Amino acid sequence: MSDIAKLLGDEADKLLKHECRGIPKARLHLPGPDFVDRVVASSDRKPAVLRNLAALFNHGRLAGSGYLSLLPVDQGVEHSAGASFAPNPDFFDPGHIVRLAIEGGCNGVASTLGVLGAVSRKYAHKIPFVVKFNHNEFLSYPNTYDQTLFADVEQAFEMGACAVGATVYFGSAESRRQIWEVSQMFKRAHELGMATILWCYLRNNAFKQGDTDYHVSADMSGQANHLGVTIEA
């Protein structure tokens, strides 16, 4: 802790000793060993979904803590794989990505249909898979903040995935279509017994006004998270 305080410098006391007085801690649904039972079990999710959630929460170094550490890799789709992996070309191999998650003690590995599908028979029983079924891509010009379906839920189910994942760019011109698409995919995933994970991003150039970037405001990012939970992420 003393090393952390040194790194934080003059901001150490403000950051390490801050206590929120607006909403008491006791009113928050905080992570814990009983998170699935305490928070999720009373929802309308099927027992198979709860089982797969428990598989995620009880795997890796953080098993039983209520926290998740996922290795997310979408390089090659939303980022140039060459720019990302050139310093370590081994990671062009999907097997190396999954092994990194295993050796790092992650709760699971989240990646594309292609990456996880290429090695599913070898690794799906060794670490929970999260198949991300929509992506942006930046070969199209001008670039747009949109998410396109790259896979369907049945493909993730057949390869043995515990969960599916998606992104919605809340606030973008395409966000309402994205919300509908992801909502329908999550519904199908729950029917098949898989958990659902959503990356809730704010994307709108109008959210930047002068030197202020409202993308990072607690109220707007909290609204994005609330919309994500509304479609049962």
Question: Across the structure, where does each feature detected by a protein language model lie?
Answer:
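Alpha/beta enzyme core
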Residues: 23-30, 63, 75-233
